[in-house]
Amino acid sequence: VFNHVGRGFWAFKDVQEKKWDSPYKDWFHISFDGNSNYNDGFWYEGWEGHFELVKLNLRHPDVQHHIFDCIRQWKDEFGIDGLRLDVAYCLDKNFIRALRGFCDSLSPDFFLVGELLHGDYNQFVGDGMLHSCTNYECYKGLYSSMNSYNLFEITHSLLRQFGPENWTLYKGKH
């Protein structure tokens, strides 16, 4: 998961210890004007309100470099050829663009799949963004159509995502 870390992450532990003097304080969304639920002496943004999961500042270049170095190591050591990005709907779109550029530089075949629970999938998938994504909206519609013979959900989802015109799936891709 690239948008948050646990409270035990080494860079966050450094911030807990050194506060303002930590070189990692800008790796997170922190305010020294408040206090966390854990009485850290500063407030920080937790992922979707879960303060045991500290949200990373994905716009900070050092955070991006750290993540990209991890990906490079995984590719070199384990031979990975793609990533499934958990909670991709929470990722900063500029970060996704930077991630795609980095991964393309590793290998033109490196594949990025994002977990998207809701929203406009087209904002996350395409040239310079993710290659593909999970589509739970259509999954639910397909499940209902197959198991309860309810075609309304899948019809609604497909029309909402792709529009009523024929061949919409191929728009701009020929």
Language-model-detected regions and their locations in the chain:
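The substrate-binding groove and active-site-proximal loops of carbohydrate-active enzymes
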Residues: 49-64, 81-90, 142-148
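Conserved alpha/beta catalytic core and glycan-binding cleft of carbohydrate-active enzymes
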Residues: 6-19, 45, 71-72, 96, ...
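Substrate-binding/active-site clefts of carbohydrate-active enzymes
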Residues: 1-72, 77, 102-105, 122-123
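Short linear motifs at secondary-structure transitions and domain/linker junctions
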Residues: 30-34, 40-42, 87-90, 110-111, ...
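The start of beta-strands in P-loop NTPase/AAA+ ATPase cores
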Residues: 79-81, 110
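A cross-domain feature marking catalytic cores of carbohydrate-active enzymes
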Residues: 1, 5, 87-89, 114-116
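An alpha-helix initiation/capping motif
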Residues: 89-97
